[in-house]
Amino acid sequence: MKKFVTLLLCMLPVSLFAQVNDGIRQAMDNYDYETVVMLIEPDCQDSLLLITKAQALKAMNRYPEAIGVLNSLILKDSTNTKVLIDLAECYKLTGNSRRAANCYQKAMNLQPENKFFRLQFIRSLLASEDYEEARTACHGWLERDSLSATGYKYLGQAYEGLQDAASAFLSYNIAYRRDSLDAQTVARIAGIFNNNQQFKDAVDVTEVYRLSDTTNIDVNRQNAKAYCMLKEYGTAVKRYESLKELGDRSFLTLYYLGVSHYGDNWFYGAYDNLKEAYQKNPMDVNVLYYLAKASARTSWKKEGVEYMEEAFRIAVPSDSMMVRLYDGLVECYDYAGDTKLSLIHI
């Protein structure tokens, strides 16, 4: 009898533990994350339960707590790639791309052939604007796989971040030759063409892409902008209206649609879109300029005067600002030892 009681007492904690585990599993299956966190003891040392707790915290957007749990697991086992990736994702979701990159790099060092880890590492570097390190990482990728269109695409982004437009274009061009249907690559190439005022080239490359897909927002933005800059306002209006139908109500889409309507002599359409762009960025002088001119040609003529006056107030520095700028200029000349120029500006 004594042995039976002892055996029963030994089995009791095991039974309770199994019940708790079943409860946690059921709560996870039912997306009841609060219950999951509640059922797992604060001082729990079980790695599987802690991973489950971190997943529940992450699902509730409680990222700092999830990060704390995952870091405690990394201290126990720094080679667990699943925990490293979960930790990287939590850092990304808190906007800390640099720390996310560090986690992806550790996972990548553990599994050098894993393309996902390498891809996420480079993306995180680009997101954190560590362009030089991203460039180096891309070259490392391309040493392993010289045919990778994605590798060249991200190399182009790294060069863009480094303000090296020529190398960026060369990288995008190689990526495009390997995969001409990658929307991001097409949009980036078209963006460089537009920035260089090669608007016809931007139209050509985007129209080729549009033969297979007319719904990509990034490609259509560059396509529409090129038509607007070429003063083909009718086509630009169609493209920008299509973008709005796709849900794009960004500042630049509204601004360029307004400008295109203005160029196409539909001033009410120009007014409506420029007014919406103005509400998003009331300090933009270009928006105020076209909004004023559109207003003057519609029923809102007094508004037109007010908008143009506002543009003047923003564009022309006040007297006090000019005095401050001149004082600063004189000070800089003095420090540079250029007394003659300093006296001229006093």
Task: Describe the function of each predicted region.
Residues 39, 43, 72-73, 106-107, ...:
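Canonical positions in the second alpha-helix
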Residues 16-71, 75-82, 93, 102:
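N-terminal leader/linker segments that initiate helical-solenoid repeat arrays
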Residues 344-346:
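Conserved small/polar residues in nucleotide/adenosyl-binding loops
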